[in-house]
Every structure is written in structure tokens, then in C-alpha cells.
Amino acid sequence: MSEICTLMKKKVLSILSLSIAFWINAQEKDSLNQKKIEEVVITGQYIQKSINKSIYKVEVIDEQQIKNMAATNAADVLNQTLNIQITPDTNSGNSTANIMGLGGDYVKILIDNIPVVGDTGLGSNIDLTKISLSNIERIEIVKGSMGVEYGNGALAGVINIITKKNSNKKLSIRAALQEETVRDGYDLKKRGKGRHIQNLNVGYNLNDHWFTNISFNHNQFMGYEGNKKGYKHFGDEKKPMRGYEWNPKDQYEINALVRYAKNKTSFFYKISYLNEKFNFYNPVSTPESLNDGNGGTTYWATDREYNTDRWIHQFNIQTNFGHIRYMGDFSYQKQDRKYFDYIYDVPNRTIVSEKPENSYYKTDVIYSRGMFSNFLNSKKFDFQLGYELDHTNGYASLIAGNFFEDSARRKIFTYGTFLSGEWNISDRFSVRPGARLSVSENFDNQFNYSLSTRWKTSGNSNLRGVFGTANRYPTYDELYTYFVNLNHDIQGNADLKPENGYSLGLFWDQGFSLRDGWKLNYNLEALYVDLKDKIELVMVKKPSTYKYLNMDTYRSLLFAANANLVKDQFSLGVRTSLNGISVSRYDMDVTSPTDFQYNFQAGANVSYKLKNIHTAFNLYYKYTGPARLYVLENEAFRIGKTDGFHMMDFIVSQPFWKDRLELSAGVKNIFDVTSVNSTTNVGNAHTAGSDRLNLYYGRSYFVRLMYQF
């Protein structure tokens, strides 16, 4: 272990030394003063502004990058980003984001700057496969605690998905068909194999002030059998093999938008509807007599179908009252996850009987966020006063968990008010302190603070220092779980208090021109996250009494270096990171070691376009190194390990007909990764752990035909 740490330190020192040399050299060269359209961001800003002037370090994945990846949903795109691991659940079909080792409960997911409704609340633990890319303009990522700006759950970071709201053309149309294999399986038949995607986006400028847009997306995943034998199989009573390792899922999404803009006032109304069907096929099929007088037998299986309906309404307005700027969001969101069981006659392919459909997760949200700024009408100093309110009705039935009652119903009203001031001390140096008070009828008042600085070290170089705090409220399971029988005693805890943490980050980026038209941009990052009172399910009485308690301390340390080299039609990006995690766990009389366990990641992307025929080649690579952490097993802590793995995608695109038509083809997951060995999961209080961690369904090939007008 000491040799690994020494090697990692040498790598980081080498990167730092090389970067400093580049920086010294850059001071003697042109600082990219050529005029260009600057990329803008909104996450954490008073108003939309240039990414180089943002006081936060914001990573942007733009529309062209998303298109080049041939991704099918937000999870596919984010999986290419270092230190963001998409965690799939093959049982539920959900995929959530993990940043610096912290799961979906600590990552705030936003669409157009407002949190998205999910199973257990607003913005956290969001299934990213439910976010399509048919009308996405860009994705903004901020790592670190953003509790002042975005409140509960924004401890590891914020992912803000920005949709399209304008067009340069009177009429714009984009339609695409994409067909993919699922590993070696592809079949267009009903209940066939593969993935089938269709989407359409139409935008229309009614006049200089009004714009409207409608988009449609259909994503049908036919499932991946793996070591199982599909829904038609029956008869294995000793070792059931029916079903899928990755269950089938079918999604429909439609979005519509109307936007008005004139002078200093703009507003838009947006509506989004998602329907998802997810099928679970029971591995066990039991013999049933046909009662035909001939001793005939068939096989029945009790299968389950899950259906999700999600509605998102959003109204956004930006205007001025005199010189005071106002930006307000008002949203009503609803998600209802339902299921029904049915008995399926497997050999005859018929449904014998169905049970009524029932809701098992239901969330109903009224949300508003408003911000006032530019009170002093000064370029030197500005401050922002804002509010955020969230009224959530939540419901979870027994299928979602075991609770004190037959179901858990919860109403939460949370109100937050926040204040920050941005002081441009000089043309080169800015500072922004901030504070937030969050009031909840269920928990004690929460206070969060932030302090951000930006120093423009040269014409195209910025050094940012960011400190922030955030909190996380307990979930349904942590508060209300109640699973007690002869063999188990697992209980939630209504007395849990919110988790609290902070992050401290230093970010440096530099850009300059080299000889012969080459341009180089690179950045260095160091980020530390510290979480107190982390909620864990711990043993409180031997041999099998467990309870959720505020017990653990979690620390994460990240060092990263990234570089991008561009010339004409060629670009190369290289990324590296080293992430260390330390967890202080307490379980009865046992305490875990607190040393950091490190994980190395690296990535690269190469893009090249032929000048004359405009054929584009894109290669994406990501390496996730072995990960280690302490796990409790047999009343002692041991090191658990998850093997490393390589991911690579290669895509070729060829435009036709004056760039209106484009044909793309490629291969994803070239190294055919499905699962990796893992000894970090010892199970929970009533289930056994698995020695394999499911990641993907293996190599796939795709073809996409896109029309743009």
C-alpha cells in the first residue's frame, strides 16, 4: 500500500511540475486575446455569464460533445466524466450519480436551475436514465458543497441540465433514429433484443420576441439476459434461470416550451411528461396442471410491471424593477411510481390473471425560488437576496420498504433564505461570501455558509478558492423503516438529525497559444469534502438488532489535472485524478481505521474531422482504478477491494446533403465490461453481499441517422 501511495504522489508531483513549467512559459506568449464567442454558465451565478468570469469552477459538456458521444440519456454522458461514477441498479432500473465516493443522496440534480422530483424528494437520488437528451443544450457540473445556493443535498456537488430555449432559425427541425445492439443481441421484433431510440425536436420563432419548442423521445431497452435465459424460459426448479440480468425498460418523454424575450424581460413556461415501463420477470416458474384429462402441465410465473408517470411544470421569469434584477422560478412536479403483479403462462405466452395497480412511491411538489440582485447598480459590488421554498407530499408503500405502518406518508415544508455579496475588489480579484438559513417543520434550523474567490492571474488564467457547507435531511428509509421478526430487528430512527458537511477547493486554469496554431488549455484542482454525523445502519444489540444512527465521519480528498490541445479540426483532451476516501465508522465496540484509501482515474478524448468531406472521428476513454475501503465483517473491519476497469467508445460520423443529414456508427464499451470483482459489499442486515459489481451490459454497436434543418 505504501508503494502505491508513493507512486501516486510521484504522478501528482510530476503533473504539478509540468503544469508550472507550462504556466511560466505561457506568461511570455499570447494569452488568447482573439475575439471568440465565450461559453456562458448559470449554475451558482447571479446572472448568466462567461465561464471564465464565473466565481465557481464550472465544468461544461456542450451540445456538440453530447452529440459526438451518441449518448442516449444523461447517465451515458456523465459516465465519461472523471470522479462521477454512474451507479446502476439492475433490479429497479435506476442509475444515480456518485461524486467523490458520495452517492445520489449527496448530489443535487437540476433541470434549468431547479431540482428534479424523485422517489424520495426533490433533487436527490435522481435516476439519470429518466433524463433524455432530445432538447439538451449543455450540462453544467460544480463539484463541492453548494448549500447556500441550492440547499438540502448539495454536499458533493450540483449537476445542472440546461435545455434549449432559442434558435437562430425561423424553423429548426432535428429528427434522429438510433439502433443499438445489447452486447451481441439485436432484434426489431416485439420483445426482441437491443435498444431502439427515436427523437424529434422542433423549434419555431413566431417573431423577434416569441419562441416555441416541442420535443419527443422514445427509448426502448429490450433487456440483457446475461447468464439468464429470457422471459420465455421455464422449468428449472432447482436453479431458476428465467428472466434478465438487466430488465427491459421502455420510456416515452415529451417536452414543450414557450418563451418570450424583449428588452430586459424574459419568461418561459415549460411542461415535461415522462412515462416509463419497467418489467421484472420472475426467475421461478412453477408447474400447473392443465386439467385436460391427459395429465398435461404448463408453467406459471408471477411477474411484475412497474410504471412511472412524471410531470414537471416550470415557469421562469427574469426582469428588472428599476435597476434591481429579479429571477424567479415556480414549479409544480409530480411523480407516481406504480406496479401490478400478474400470473403469466410461460409456454403459452398468455396472461392468466392480473392484480390491481398500486402506487408504491408518490411525490407531489410545489417549489419556488426567487433571487433579487443589482440593488446598488454598481459594477464594483453587488449582492443577492433570495428565497427557496419546497412543499413536498411523499408516500411510500410496503413494496418500497418496511415501515412502522403499512405505508409512510410525509409532508415536508422547507423554507430557505440566502444572502451573498460579490465584491470586485479590482479587475483581477473578486470575492463572494454567502449565508443561508433553512427552516423545516420536521428538523432543527440549518445554517450554511460559503466564501468564494477568483483571482485573474493573467489574461487567460484564473485561480479560484471555494469554501462551502451543506446539509442533508434523513430519508424515508432512515426515519421510518421497521422490519422486525424472529430473525431480524431493523428500525429507522425518527430522532435522526440532518447530516452536515463542508468542502474546500482550489482550482487553477490556464490557456495560451503555441506555435503553428496550436492552443493549449489546462487546469489543476484540489478539493476536500468533510461530512459529519453521516447516517448509517449500525448494530446496536447483538446478534441482529440494527438501527439508523448519526455515527460516521466521511472525508474525501481529490487532486485532478486536465489538459486540452486543439488545432484546426483536431482536439485532444487528457484527464487524471487521484481521490482518497477516509471513513470513521463505529459499530458496537468496533471502530474502523481512518487512513485514506486512494483511487486513480484517467481519461482521454480524441476528435478529428476530415477537411474536405467532413467525416468526424471521436474516441472516448476512461480508466477507473482499483478502489479500496474498510468494511465491517464478523465484528471486525477489513479492506474490501473493487477491481479497476477500462471503458472506450469510438464513433464515426458522416454528414450529407449540405450537412442536413448525418449518418453515425460506432462501438461502445469496446473492452466489453459487464461486471467487476468486488469484496466491498458484505450485504446488509438481512441480505447477503455479492462478490460481483454490475456496471454495464457489455460491448454494443450502434447506427444513428439524423436529419437537421
Residue ranges of model-derived segments:
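Gram-negative outer-membrane beta-barrel transporters
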Residues: 424-427, 519-530, 549-632, 706-708
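N-terminal periplasmic accessory domains that precede
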Residues: 39, 74-77, 95-98, 110, ...
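Extracytoplasmic beta-strand/coil segments of soluble accessory domains associated
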Residues: 58, 75-115
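Flexible loop and strand-edge segments within Gram-negative outer membrane beta-barrel domains
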Residues: 221-255, 259-322, 326, 334-362
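C-terminal beta-signal and adjacent terminal beta-strands/loops
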Residues: 222, 227, 611, 625-630, ...
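Short, acidic, small-residue-rich periplasmic hinge/interaction motif at the N-terminus
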Residues: 27-67, 104
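Membrane-embedded beta-barrel scaffold of Gram-negative outer-membrane proteins
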Residues: 325-341, 456, 464, 497-555
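Short acidic/polar hinge/loop motifs at secondary-structure boundaries
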Residues: 115-143
